[in-house]
Amino acid sequence: MKSATLLALSFLLIASCFLICEAEHSRYEEHEILEENMGDVVNLEQRSCAKPGEMCMRIKCCDGQCGCNRGTGRCFCK
């Protein structure tokens, strides 16, 4: 009985670690995309939005992807 309890607790610990890591990774990726949208002058044409329908340079994106005009820096829906 003790070994079954220990095995179950080990499984729960591993599962919770996996879920925590997965949650942190998705937030980190979203943060990176938002940071890219805020001031990456080098990659203006390759900016993307973290979530569909999000604002990119104050312009709402259509499908989660937006492009940026080199001259003005304003984004448009792709």
Swiss-Prot record:
Disulfide bonds: C49-C62, C56-C66, C61-C77
Single GO molecular function: toxin activity
Signal peptide: 1-23
Propeptide regions on this chain: 24-47
Keywords for this protein: Disulfide bond, Ion channel impairing toxin, Knottin, Secreted, Signal, Toxin
Principal localisation: secreted
Superkingdom assignment: Eukaryota
Compartments in which it is found: Secreted
Tissues/organs with expression: Expressed by the venom gland.
Listed GO CC annotations: extracellular region
Record remark on domains: The presence of a 'disulfide through disulfide knot' structurally defines this protein as a knottin.
Function: Putative ion channel inhibitor.
Similarity comment: family membership: Belongs to the hainantoxin family. 20 subfamily.
Protein name, per record: Hainantoxin-XX.3
